[in-house]
């Protein structure tokens, strides 16, 4: 893929990633919620002069349509130009062993890794790939958890966070120009919570319709306004739905109930308040862990459990919490 033309606010992460890729052997995982800019960061690093100089052979392999170990092997083999009888796991390992220094990027690796019934085989295959010392492995994954059986390069990159306000503003004006009212731009960026995908989508609309019209549309359409595209790179709702429909979320259905409650709390909730409010949600600790592992929620600097604004808006619109779940929480806060 081509190098991103708009890239603001990830300079520290980029330097950290490139430094990790220059170590031997490099095994790096980029984590974070959907739309946070994982792929953009990786592609920018892929075009870094230092990375290009070190790795004469570089493969970028999308895994978002890969569901099983067999399809993962077939997809990697195809990108390595191994066909027919030479498209097996054994042939992939042999081929990479004979290559010079190689960078192997597996993008959206959560798709094959998430299903619990196939995870062991997926991780065993990753371990085989990392046995080849001159092959650097770089994966991107939704969530906050790295696959096991791989000795990931230290120091780890933290899961990506939203952009800083300045970086989000720079991104916006680079797409929509500087002709807009500063107050209206600020209101639009507040909607996005500085998630890169949301900033990009709202800036594209503002560029053609203006900030005021975009704000008026948001009041009516909410996240549907940012969902005109047909894939998760251009459609915020598709990106959120992918996280909501992950196997991990499906394994603990009450996690959606907790997400619904959190969608009502723009400032999040402390661990103490969450437990003392006694919401009618079974396995609440497991639900919290699930939301954190899928990056549908996060812990802020004050230790509060929170959900990013675009996800809150989507959940309130499409799967709002039922009154019997909200009632204990409302009573608890009213009694404080």
Spans of features found by a protein language model:
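Post-nucleotide-binding-loop coupling segment downstream of the phosphate-binding loop, primarily
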Residues: 3-8, 12-22, 26-105, 109-115, ...
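Alpha-helical sensor/transducer elements of the RecA-like P-loop NTPase core
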Residues: 10-12, 40-44, 70-75, 103, ...
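Phosphate/oxyanion-binding loops and surfaces in catalytic or ligand/nucleic-acid-binding neighborhoods
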Residues: 24, 36, 49, 79-83, ...
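C-terminal boundary/linker of central alpha/beta nucleotide-binding cores
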Residues: 42-43, 185, 192, 203-207, ...
């Amino acid at each position: 893929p081509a190098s991103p033309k708009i890239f603001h606010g990830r300079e520290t992460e980029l330097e950290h990633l490139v430094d990790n890729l220059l170590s031997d052997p490099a095994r790096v995982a980029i984590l974070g919620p959907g739309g946070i800019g994982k792929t953009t960061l990786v592609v920018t690093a892929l075009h870094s002069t230092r990375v290009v100089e070190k790795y004469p052979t570089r493969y970028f392999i999308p895994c978002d349509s890969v569901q099983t170990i067999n399809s993962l092997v077939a997809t990697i083999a195809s990108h390595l130009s191994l066909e027919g009888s030479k498209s097996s796991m054994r042939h992939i390992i042999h081929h990479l062993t004979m290559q010079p220094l190689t960078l192997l990027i597996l993008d959206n690796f959560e798709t094959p890794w998430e299903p619990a019934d196939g995870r062991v085989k997926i991780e065993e295959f990753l371990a085989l790939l990392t046995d080849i010392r001159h092959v650097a492995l770089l994966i991107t994954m939704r969530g906050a958890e790295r696959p096991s059986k791989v000795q990931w390069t230290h120091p780890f990159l933290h899961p990506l966070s939203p952009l800083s306000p300045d970086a989000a503003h720079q991104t916006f004006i680079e797409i929509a120009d500087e002709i807009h009212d500063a107050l209206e731009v600020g209101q639009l960026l507040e909607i996005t919570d500085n998630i890169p995908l949301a900033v990009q989508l709202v800036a594209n609309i503002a560029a053609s319709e203006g900030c005021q019209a975009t704000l008026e549309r948001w009041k009516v359409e909410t996240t549907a306004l940012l969902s005109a595209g047909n894939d998760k790179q251009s459609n915020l709702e598709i990106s959120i739905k992918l996280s909501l429909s992950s196997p991990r979320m499906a394994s603990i259905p009450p996690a959606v109930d907790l997400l619904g409650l959190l969608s009502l709390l723009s400032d999040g909730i402390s661990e103490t308040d969450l437990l003392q409010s006694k919401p009618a949600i079974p396995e609440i600790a497991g639900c919290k862990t699930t939301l954190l592992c899928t990056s549908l929620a996060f812990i802020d600097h004050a230790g509060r459990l929170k959900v990013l604004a675009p996800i809150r808006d989507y959940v309130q619109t499409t799967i709002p919490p039922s009154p019997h779940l909200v009632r204990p929480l409302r009573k608890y806060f009213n009694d404080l």
